[in-house]
Amino acid sequence: MKRFFFLVLIFQNAFSQEIPLNVQKIIKAYPDQIIGYKDNKIIFSDKTTLIYDDFKNKTDQELLDSPDIEDQFKFVYNKADKNLIPKDDPGRIRNEAFFKKIYGNSKSEVESKMTEIIWCPKLVNQKIKVTTVNGIDKIIKKLSAELDNNPEFKKYIIDIGGTFNWRKISGTNRLSMHSFGMTIDINIKNSNYWQWDCNCKNEDATLSYRNQIPLKLVSIFEKYGFIWGGNWKHYDTMHFEFRPELLL
């Protein structure tokens, strides 16, 4: 029996060593859609695959416009910290094909997986549409219930800026994460966005970081698998996006 468990341990260690750490995080974060990894390819539950690493050196703009899946982990996401002045954009690099495989390849396919829930029933009582993929609707209900116990956050979470909206990111040809129903923009009146503050769309513009969102509020979102756009050099402090793989 001891020999059996020893062999199992060896197999598990070999498996872990064969699969890159960040791929292991992806598999753990999206178990219903991703079933494995082989020959530098992510294997999805429908047996289709996507290249994990294209081994190309990319400029900052190329990382945004044509990243592979591995590039999504280029910058480490650090949880909310009062001393944080972001110098990178962790989570802002996204492989569009990957998220289409997870949530839907078109507006109609994404919409077929949507449901309506009540956002913060006690403090806000606002109807919003979110995806049911990976139980995100249930996760947001739990997030919502916790926020409801913090009335000091009401002004930030009322009249939220949006959830589902199949569209391109302003000034780009890249699909917004709002297209997948797994992103929440909270109240824009108490938020900052780099394009508004610099009155530009130039990624190379010199920016002065601004934020009004309490970090305790951010920490609650992070607890439920959401990263914060205020953690980016190109800050978007209203923006919360379900990316549990970056928090593992």
Predicted regions and their residues:
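Cell-envelope/glycan interface and biosynthesis
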Residues: L21-W232
